[in-house]
Amino acid sequence: MLKKLLSLVSLWIPLFLYAQGVTISGYTYDGLTQKGLANCRVSIKTSTMDTLLAQVTTVLQTERTEENGNVFVYQNTQIGALFMLQFNAPISAQAYHLVIEKEGYESIEKIISAKSLQKERLDLGDFYLFPKRKDKILGEAVVKATKIKMYYKGDTLVYNAGAFNVSQMDKLKSLVAQLPGTELKDGVLKVNGRPIENLMLSGKDFFNGNIQAALDNLPAYVVSKIKVYEKAGDMSELTGRNMHDKSYVMDVKLKREYIGTWIAKLQADGGTSRLWGSQGMLMRMDDRQMFTANFDANNLNEKREMSEMGDGADLFLAGRFKRWNAKVNYFYEPNRYWRFRTEAQVERLQSLLNEQSYQQTFFPSKDLFNRSRQQNKERQYTTNAFAAVRYRFKKQQHELQYTFRFGHHRRQSEKIALSWYDSITTQNWATISLDSLYAQEKDKSQTPLLFSLFHPTLSKQVENVHTLSLASIYTLRKNVLKTYLRYQAMTENDTHNENYILTRYTPVSPDWRRNYIKDRSQAQKAEMRAEYIWKVAEKERNNGELTPYIEYKYNHGDATHSLYRLDWDSHFATYDWFSKLVDISSISDFQASCMDYNNSYNSTLTEHHSAIGTQFNFQHKTEKGNVFDIRATAETSLAHRSLAYLRGGLSHHIQCKSWLFTPNLTLKWEEGNTEDQRWLSSAQILYKGTPRLVNMLHLLPVRDDSDPNNISQGNQHLKNAWEQNLQLLYQSRHRTMQHLWLLEAQWRHVFNDFTFLSAYNSRTGHRIYTPQNTNRTHWLEGATSYAIPLGKAQKLWLTAKLSGDYYQGEILSYIDGTALSQNQLLQSLTITPQLYLTANISSKFRASVLWSTALQSVQQPQATNNYRTTRLRSDFTWQLPWDVELQSDINTLIYKGYSERSINQTAIRWNASLHKYFQLSHGTLSVGFKVYDILHQANSLQTSIDQFSRIENYTNVMPRYALLSLVYMTNWSSKKRSKE
């Protein structure tokens, strides 16, 4: 009996010593060739090296591809050789010893803590094994792995995600911002100066071309590699030939263990100043389908992440926003024939914006100044839906798409404005508060004030848009026929209520009125296009095609604009008139007496646009591998437009027929990638000519004085405009040192550009706008940058950049009684030097520092204004012991030369946060504490300058606050794991 008990105890002891089964995975590469290295022996032992827990051999991954109906199976050497160690982790072990060995290569050893194995899975990323040197004496020396950040595989740029520092809660956007050569600005993602046209996920267009959605939703820790390359389009895939339809894409490769895995995230925020937020995400992706669902509700101005390195968003977000958003996306590709995509989104946005504006209008004799304060309250509801189905059969492809949009927008605002001419008396008025200035001047018999305006408004807008399209591709031997059909129907209903209290400090009588405006419009658009791609050359070195095409567009729209006006009368109490907005629910009672027939109208616009053109594509490869690309397009079109317009009892009928010519030319050169070259260069020159049609409403001989301060009238002599755009892009990179030099330049000129002649009344301050043509509008932009890694380990990257832009516009503003000066130009020149340093010191620390100074000079005939804005930004993320993460960022803006003296100073926004991560049995919990604007100096300033005026806007911003955040992230697999 005793022997049986001892036997049972001996069987149970290992079950307690080995607590749970874990899986450790990773990839092995040849450190020189950057290819997957198979047959490496990977062993895991206890830290004392006395017990071997598991041992496997790395293997290359097998992939399938289909081309012309044939299935090819091959081993992919570009994604690394995989190893997966499965074993039971002993409770008594304090650490584990991982050894990677292969004959002829330096071995790699890595210590793994027991705490890191609390999860069921652990991905170690990529390991690069280097061949042994012949003169090295083999001993017990251990070679530590160095992760290579980036390398080129042919024309494909590959980033190793494991070599960059990302926290457990970072999104893909944070990882992409660290990649050398990438830039994310104004919603455009660029790599080496070239815009990314699409973001793929394991080679599939899961996000339907929405790059921002991919950056904001995909967790960074699931990414293995990021590849940037030119991807062949649908025509090339169907024909198996080069059809010149490549696009520049970023392809995100997931770690193998997360394919087929559900990923979920929940977040809750609460802080001072009554701030709150909640966020959730659910996602799953495999080889055939992807599902994502997320929601977000917060009043944090949508600035939810602590610090995203390289983020180009505004430093100080204006206004206060509350946002509720929910979105579902599904992609399914069951086989090579069918593909389904669908997306639905519902959003509610509520905002409060307090804005102060300072405007200086340029005149030859004296300038006009205007100061205003305005509060805007808005509520928006939008619903967007999208569905698409694609079918491929043999040599055909058809894709049907449907989109729907519903929007409801309500806006209420209150505005007060003062206006005066420049004089000695008014020199200091920019520094006096608006209310004090009004109280000081309103009762004076002699005041420099020109007028004051109180203007509360209430508007509502409802719109519906339906769009249906069908795109088809037919392959005819070596050639391709493409067709495209599209139909769109849109309706919009607007209502607008306003009190308009205009007081003039001149002998002219004041203008006090109430307006009610009702707009109804509907439009239908149809489009048809057919093109035939004819292969004229198909050789290894010469490949070309000629594409004749025809296109037809139809547009028909009806609009009704009804204006009801009620002038002030003595029986209205002044208090009610000033403070209460008119809310006319039924206009039938006074429709006949209040209708403003002179400013109400009905219009019907019909457009027919027919085009015929030819596109020529040709590619030539030299013996040395240099590539020359030519793409030329010539299009001739006829635009026939008619406008029926009824206003003030008068009927107008206008017809315009315009012959248009649209040329495009792109020349591209890429240097061949040969072993004897140190530098690889490429250049691109693009010219584009675009005709711009005149607005038919501007041709009408009518006068609109519904706004007594801004009167507009038509010009029957307006001509069509012609825009020319010339761009140059040159880049050169060093093969081994990874230095990158970029040069960009762009020139734009508009012949017969559309602008407005502004005539100001010196007594009343009202202005009359008349559309005009001008030939003196020019833009010139340029930038050059040089990026280098500091050190062989590429832990530091420095980018130096110098950019400049020049704008020239003709001044067409004058005061009545003075002649319009000829050849008066406004010229604006801005030069901006910039330095940007990023650092990934280790897997625990990353940081970035940016400095830039924008030097702007604005010249007009009587004055020259100089502005300077210096921007300093630094941030870091430091992963401390005990799973604690510290983040901080400091953003500094230094203003000089602005009218408001209070702005000409230094504004610093300093944020900091601390996160503690808890590894739970089924996920990760993060507890974070964040302090925003520690020094309480954040502000918002926006400026704009053109040939008419200079405008400075100052808006309210987020207050200083402290925020507590709880984030829980987990993942689980729906696959059944086999026991081995």
Q: Residue locations for each model-derived region?
A:
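Structural motif
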Residues: Y27-A38, T51, K147
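Short, acidic, small-residue-rich periplasmic hinge/interaction motif at the N-terminus
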Residues: Y29, S43, V99-E103, R121-G162, ...
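Short, acidic Ser/Thr/Gly-rich low-complexity loop/linker segments typical of extracellular
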Residues: D50-M84
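Primarily recognizes Gram-negative and organellar outer-membrane beta-barrels
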Residues: E66, G209-Q212, A232-R274, R288-E980
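Short, polar/charged loop or turn motifs at beta-strand boundaries
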Residues: T156-Q178, V191, L201-F206, Q267-T272
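Extracytoplasmic beta-strand/coil segments of soluble accessory domains associated
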Residues: K173-F207, K225, D234-H244
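Short acidic/polar hinge/loop motifs at secondary-structure boundaries
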Residues: D205-A232, D287
